[in-house]
UniProtKB/Swiss-Prot annotation:
Taxonomic lineage from the root: Bacteria, Bacillati, Bacillota, Clostridia, Peptostreptococcales
Domain of life: Bacteria
Gene Ontology BP term (one): translation
Protein name, entry field: Large ribosomal subunit protein uL11
NCBIfam families linked: L11_bact (TIGR01632)
Length: 141
């Protein structure tokens, strides 16, 4: 018989840096999950992706056990890393902060493909390009 799910928790945690401090501790604590168990597993699984923010979906079961799925980093984080930006533009329509090639857009789209609801890489590329535009990044062909 399958275990009964009592909750799902979605968090974005820096890779390899999960600690029992907020936001992780309180979110897991209210569902009665072993916080140290989660932080150790998460840090071990994401140690190779240091410096990235990793979205994670934690499924909590009735017996207080849990399972979790890590996703690919958000598109904005990947764009900032590819262009070595601190942050996007405060006024993306007026101030442009960087230029990005379509090859870089394709690379990020291929990395994000498993988590995007896009049928093709081209559709994924247009999603990534839209995110880049909203950050004040100009896409060049």
């Amino acid at each position: 018989m399958a275990k009964k799910v009592i909750g799902q928790i979605k968090l974005q945690i820096p890779a390899g840096k999960a600690t029992p401090a907020p936001p992780v501790g309180p979110a897991l604590g209210q569902h009665g999950v072993n916080i140290m168990g989660f932080t150790k597993e998460f840090n071990a699984k994401t140690a190779d992706q240091a410096g990235m923010i990793i979205p994670v979906v934690i499924t909590v079961y009735q017996d207080r056990s849990f399972s979790f799925i890590t996703k690919t980093p958000p598109a904005a984080v990947l764009i900032k890393k590819a262009l070595n930006l601190k942050s996007g533009s405060g006024e993306p329509n007026k101030k442009k902060v960087a230029k990005m090639t379509s090859a870089q857009v394709r690379e990020i789209a291929e990395l994000k493909m498993p988590d995007l609801n896009a049928a093709s890489v081209e559709a994924a590329m247009s999603m990534i390009a839209g995110t880049a535009r909203s950050m004040g990044v100009v896409i060049e062909d």
